């Protein structure tokens, strides 16, 4: 069985080489490994911590390494990132363990020759009392390294929000966000679901703002729980649930959900409608459509039809709807805390406004008279 650090190293290498999604590969790794709850929690904290603080960690590697950064083996870079992160940000890990376990990882990833190199860098950092020398860096350049936020983003937020609000935004990118779920009220009562989850060691509490919304803790391996397999709930962020509350679909209405995957709004709307009416749930990719269909089946929701569709192109086969939901593609800057890799994968978004407008224009054509559109996006860009 792999150790928590070995699991983390594998995940970070995948992020670096394959451009994977952090939440998806972490969940998959935990279903493939029989690590206990404590090890999974440690691995998740280290994994997300390294992703969040990557710019700071890479600055330290460059500062202490005698080898050019681009010439260091990917696995060794990740080992050093993990080592520096534990030394700086994980007070529960003794310094000696952070160094020794990092050195041991070199054997695990067939980089035995790098053991002395890793050991020397981390121990030199310790001898310097873990101080970060920012040299001549000032202003936005220093903030960028200190808070591990790309300089273009620091500059953008300073310009658009002002320095005080920008600092609040930068700080808000750290730490793991709460995990929320929506109870499948078509089949189960909220209190019964909470009881079932807690009997399996998963903490659950009602949210006071949204009916049937529960906040979860100790969720590692939740997809293996009997509550999950019974279709008692689906994971959905509270902001997404708020969109459904605003949409307020009614019994026997028709709802069209464009850009639907992974389907949270579709499922919640079906539950609000008590599984009475019709929901047409669309996505561009067949694989994502399958995810929607399979989850609807797990939840026992019968009014959902999932299908492929390009939301930027008008489709005359889509029926007229009472509500159309548009969760349009965006830069994702509003969900950095949930997906920290967004900071490092800056996409060219010059076409996004055009794409968003095309989707919105088409959505209006699917509406019945007096129908309503709910338009949402997970960015904060102007």
Which residues does each predicted region cover?
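S-adenosylmethionine
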Residues: 1-382
């Amino acid at each position: 069985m792999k150790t928590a650090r070995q699991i983390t190293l594998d995940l970070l290498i995948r992020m670096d080489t394959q451009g994977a999604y952090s939440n998806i590969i972490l969940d998959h790794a935990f279903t493939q490994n029989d690590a206990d709850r404590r090890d999974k929690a440690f691995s998740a904290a280290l994994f997300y911590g390294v992703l969040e603080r990557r710019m700071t960690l890479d600055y330290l590697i460059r500062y202490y390494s005698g080898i050019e950064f681009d010439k260091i083996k990917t696995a060794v870079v990740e080992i050093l990132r993990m080592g520096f992160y534990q030394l700086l940000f994980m007070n529960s890990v003794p310094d000696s363990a952070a160094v020794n376990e990092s050195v041991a990882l070199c054997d695990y990833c067939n980089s035995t020759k790098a053991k002395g190199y890793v050991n020397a860098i981390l121990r030199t950092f310790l001898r310097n009392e873990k101080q970060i020398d920012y040299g001549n860096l000032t202003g936005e350049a220093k903030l960028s390294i200190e808070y591990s936020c790309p300089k273009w983003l620091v500059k953008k937020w300073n310009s658009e929000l002002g320095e005080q609000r920008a600092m609040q935004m930068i700080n808000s990118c750290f730490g793991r966000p709460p995990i929320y779920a929506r109870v499948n009220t078509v089949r189960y009562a909220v209190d019964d679901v909470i009881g079932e989850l807690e009997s399996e060691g998963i903490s659950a509490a009602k949210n006071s703002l949204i009916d049937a919304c529960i906040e979860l803790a100790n969720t590692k391996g939740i997809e293996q729980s009997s509550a999950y397999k019974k279709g008692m709930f689906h994971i959905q962020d509270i902001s997404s649930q708020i969109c459904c509350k605003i949409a307020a679909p009614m019994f026997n209405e028709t709802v069209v959900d464009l850009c639907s995957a992974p389907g949270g709004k579709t499922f919640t709307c079906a539950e609000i409608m008590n599984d009475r009416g019709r929901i047409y749930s669309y996505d561009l990719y067949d694989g994502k459509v399958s995810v929607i269909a399979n989850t609807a089946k797990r939840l026992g929701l019968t009014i959902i039809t999932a299908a492929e569709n390009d939301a930027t192109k008008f489709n005359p086969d889509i029926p007229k709807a009472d509500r159309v939901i548009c969760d349009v593609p965006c830069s994702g800057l509003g969900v950095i805390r949930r997906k920290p890799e967004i900071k490092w994968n800056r996409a060219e978004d010059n076409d996004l406004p055009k794409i968003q407008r095309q989707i919105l224009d088409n959505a209006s054509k699917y509406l019945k008279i007096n129908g309503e559109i709910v338009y949402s996006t997970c960015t904060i860009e102007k």
